[in-house]
Every structure is written in C-alpha cells, then in structure tokens.
C-alpha cells in the first residue's frame, strides 16, 4: 500500500526530528546505501578464517569461545590479540582466572609490553573495567577469561555454603545489555572464553552446557566450540594437539562449518601447518606420497619438513596464504610479520 503525501510528509518530519535529536543515521532506509564490508581480526589459522566465512572474527561483535579444559580456547583468543596488535590495534585481557602466562603469550606473538591486563577481584569489577575500556573507543579487542571465573561480589563475600542461584546469569545478562551497543560503536571485538558443565539427568541430546546463563548465547554473533581431537607426537614425546573448531553460531556468514589445525606446545597455532592443509585442499600445494610441492618446488618430505621449510621461507608462506585467500574470496593477507601497521578507525 503506497504512502499518502500526508503520511510521507509526516514521516520526513519525524526522521528530521530523530536525526536532530539522536544524530544523523539514527534511522535509515535499508536500501539507501550499501553496507560496508564487515571488518575482521584474523584468528591466526587460515582454516578457521575460512570456516568463519569472512576471514576472521568480526569487529564490533561478541564472540564466545568455549570447550573442555586444555582444548586451546585461550590460544585461539591470544592469536586474535596478536593479530589485532600487528594491525596497529590496542588490546586488553581481563584475566579473571588469574592464569595468563606472559611467556606463552609472547611466544604466540602478543606484544606483552603494550597489552592491557586486569586481574579483578569480582565479576562486577571485571565487567565494569571492560565497559570503561570499551567506551573509551581506543580498544580493538578485549578478552574476558573466563565467564566461569566472573564470580558475583555477593558470592565472594558470603559464606562457603550459601546459595546464590542465578546471580551470575543476572550479572551477565545486565552486562551484555550495556556492552553490545558500546562494542558496535567502538568497533571493538569482545571474546568471552567459557567453560563447559554437564546438566544432570539429561536423557536425550548433549548434556553439555556453558556457564553464565543463556544471555551470552543470544548476544554472541559468533560461537566457537573448541575440541582437542588428537595428540601430536615427535617419537614418543607429545609436542602439541590437533584441534577442531566448530562454528556453532554465526550471524555474519553461514554457520556450522568447522576447521582443524595444530597447536604446538609453547608456540601456539601452527600457521604453516594450516597453510599446508588448506593449500592441499584447494589444489595450490601438490601432495604426492609424502612429498609436498608448490609451483614445481619441493617444500619437503612429510608435513613437519614442509612446515619447517615454510617457517624458514616466509615469502613462500605469504604467497601461498595470499593465493588461498584470493581463491576463496576472504580478503587480503594481514598477519605477515613484515606487514606495515594498518590505520585503525574508531
């Protein structure tokens, strides 16, 4: 039904009043202008960037990373922090678990000298600090590790056996209502690391659930389920884990894709290993028996030798990464060591 001239005029007056009161762009027609592509922060694994559909974690959104203990949740978050810093951004880490290892963070590539770290006493303090940092508009990424450790003040000050049903869920719900718009306006990515619990008496379906109530599930634009699927060994010594990440929720691209990559102890996600896996899958790297070749040049016999060759020849790794991203249409290469810092828009 077409709008009458009177209705159209009334609407224009209302829109003018809204723009005057709340700022230009507060209300707009969906077809007026094309939306800018979603800005991203690379994860450090090209296979995970591809699974996310846009080339990394979306800026201005909430991301939940959950999984069993020692599955690689913090490693994934720290790689995102390192990549944000390489792009010239500022990062913060709310260490509610008081378990951040600075040496491991540095090995992953995090600039620990400029990383903002807080070890709060209560959940309220943690979320208030996060809110103030986000509203400053100067932050590109913030990690909260973990939701389970955001203990409400009443629980800390109470007796050990006291019942505090639903306190943490209410705290999270209230905080996320405040944080969502602030994150969007500041283009800050918030990564909430979460733990798994088991629901008692579940007969059908998965008994696993995450802590902190249901609010985080709703407010998250991306939810990543991180699982360790295999132990990597050098002879009889364990040197790392094979990790599978499933994108169980994705508001910015099709969900339910998954990625596999290696996490090497003391080093983090093997970028070269991910490039080899994706290169073979996309036909950019040729695998014949145990040998890997690229453009007729041998990378090595066996994955470990190919990985070592690419680590020693970063130009080859960067070229392969660029070709994979161009073929899959997920944006430019951004996490090369030699890349110039990109300007940061707030």
Curated annotation (Swiss-Prot):
PROSITE patterns: RECA_1, RECA_2, RECA_3. GO terms for cellular component: cytosol. Keywords: ATP-binding, Cytoplasm, DNA damage, DNA recombination, DNA repair, DNA-binding, Nucleotide-binding, SOS response. One of its GO terms (biological process) is DNA repair. It is found in: Cytoplasm. It holds the Pfam family RecA_C. ATP binds at residues 67-74. One of its GO terms (molecular function) is ATP binding. The keyword Cytoplasm applies. It comes from the Bacteria. Belongs to the RecA family. Can catalyze the hydrolysis of ATP in the presence of single-stranded DNA, the ATP-dependent uptake of single-stranded DNA by duplex DNA, and the ATP-dependent hybridization of homologous single-stranded DNAs. It interacts with LexA causing its activation and leading to its autocatalytic cleavage. This is Protein RecA. It comes from Saccharopolyspora erythraea (strain ATCC 11635 / DSM 40517 / JCM 4748 / NBRC 13426 / NCIMB 8594 / NRRL 2338). The lineage of its organism: Bacteria, Bacillati, Actinomycetota, Actinomycetes, Pseudonocardiales. The gene is recA.
